[in-house]
Amino acid sequence: REVILNKDFTEMGYMTELLLYASARAQLVKENIKPALDAGQAVIADRFVDSSAVYQGIGRGLGVDTVYKVNEFALQGIMPDMTFLMDLDAQEGISRKKNQAELDRMENEKLEFHQKVVDGYRMLADMHPERIVKIDATLPIDEIHGIITEYVEKKLNL
């Protein structure tokens, strides 16, 4: 991920970007996710294949189906049971990020790209309501925490 997000690699091809993310994901599955699942543990990840479906598939125009096909081998059949989409307007998301830290290569993209990404996430949430929970990211953080906690407790029968 460090190479992929390096802002100095501005000429990286979109397919290269997709393949590098799939490779990083394959290693994550091998080293962390699969062993944890095999041990009966719950796994929480901040991003997974849906991010590539949106960023590379929609934002870069490679196609959502292409992204899922490329990642199929890397994921070894593992897909998230639940995804939380922090739904936020693209401009607001950029503004928040600029106030936090130095932007990486993806974060430095134009507003048009980020709008495609937001629209893509919303489309995926509409396509997969059984596993993607859309949360209004303008809500106070305590409310967001409560919503997520409620869904996780219900999913894990806690």
Question: Which residues are covered by each model-predicted region?
Answer:
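NTP-dependent small-molecule kinase module
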Residues: Q91-L158
